[in-house]
């Protein structure tokens, strides 16, 4: 979470990092001290669903807890251990975090939402549901240089691990479980596995220079003034 402040008459960004794990915050503080960036950082050990700041923020980044199915290139066991129930449980938690965090964003502020999940239920559908329920928010298309081949038609960023894509031309006919190289990647293990793969291939979302990357999803929303 970030808000604008003033220091010696100069506008500066003030970052508040909230995490339920004190251990992860210790690692963050250690890194920030090494980089000499602690002066503008406040850390808070709290549950994201109960944290209530005294001031609102201009930017909020939600690195949401998720099924982590996008990391299966490095952790192939995930596709054998994760279930549809795991995805549904994370989807419910993500929705609650989004709704709570939205209360603390200033008008015109930006809300960024990110997961390392391949499931649309934790990405595209999660955001579409949110903006339907919260019409004071709108999608702010991500147009950063270098992301041209990673953008969806809605303005989100969606990246898939390279091995998730077939070696054949990216057509719906070739985007099968067999060609994706994961026969166990089924709707039983991950809802929308087939359709996610098809949608991503159709939109041309895997850039050649992203080889070796995990799968992830990013959306940017803006609160209307």
Question: What does each model-identified segment do?
Answer:
Residues 1-225:
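S-adenosylmethionine
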């Amino acid at each position: 979470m970030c808000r604008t402040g003033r220091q010696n008459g100069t506008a500066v960004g003030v970052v508040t990092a909230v995490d339920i794990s004190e251990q992860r915050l210790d690692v963050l503080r250690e890194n920030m001290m090494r980089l000499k960036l602690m002066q503008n950082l406040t850390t808070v050990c709290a549950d994201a669903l109960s944290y209530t700041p005294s001031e609102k923020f201009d930017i909020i980044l939600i690195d949401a807890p998720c099924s982590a199915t996008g990391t299966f290139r490095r952790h192939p066991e995930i596709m054998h251990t994760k279930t549809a129930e795991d995805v549904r449980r994370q989807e419910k938690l993500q929705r609650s975090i989004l709704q709570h965090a939205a209360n603390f964003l200033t008008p015109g502020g930006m809300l960024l939402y990110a997961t390392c999940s391949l499931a649309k239920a934790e990405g595209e559908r999660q955001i579409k549901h949110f903006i339907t329920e919260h019409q004071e928010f709108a999608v702010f298309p991500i147009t950063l240089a270098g992301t041209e081949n990673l953008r969806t038609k809605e303005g989100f960023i969606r990246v898939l691990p390279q091995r998730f894509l077939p070696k054949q031309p990216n057509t719906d006919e070739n985007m099968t479980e067999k060609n994706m190289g994961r026969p166990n990647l089924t709707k039983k293990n991950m809802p929308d596995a087939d359709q996610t793969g098809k949608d991503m291939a159709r939109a041309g979302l895997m850039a050649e220079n992203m080889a070796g990357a995990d799968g992830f999803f990013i959306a940017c929303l803006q609160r209307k003034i």
